[in-house]
Amino acid sequence: IIRGDSGIDIETVSVSIQNSLCFGLLDGTRQIGFARLVTDFATFGYLCDVYVLNDYQKSGLGRWLIECCHAHPLMSRLRRIMLVTDSAPWLYQKMGYLPLNRPDFVWQINRPDMYRKTEGK
């Protein structure tokens, strides 16, 4: 599933998937959800790209998808699992995630328009 508004090209999506532990959510043979874990496979994981198609939202499938991610044997050995999101904070809190509201603790370089094509190119 590639969100059309992301601006990310298919090659970048492919490389990101190849270098992640991925989880798919299917309705028959149709993919309706996705999540991936970027990890060192020992101590740290970054849960990202958690997505359920609009027609399937509000049915508990997003929570179930995250539960499936958490049930993977690798997850039990990770000391820290992080995610960055601006949607459904109530869901992630129910799943054991806590907001990091400590100053000078988490830092980032954020380039939100990295994959957007500029006009004229």
Where are each of the predicted segments found?
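Active-site-proximal cofactor/substrate-binding loop regions of enzyme domains
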Residues: 38, 66-69
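Conserved acetyl-CoA pyrophosphate-binding loop and the N-cap/start of the following alpha-helix
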Residues: 56, 60-65
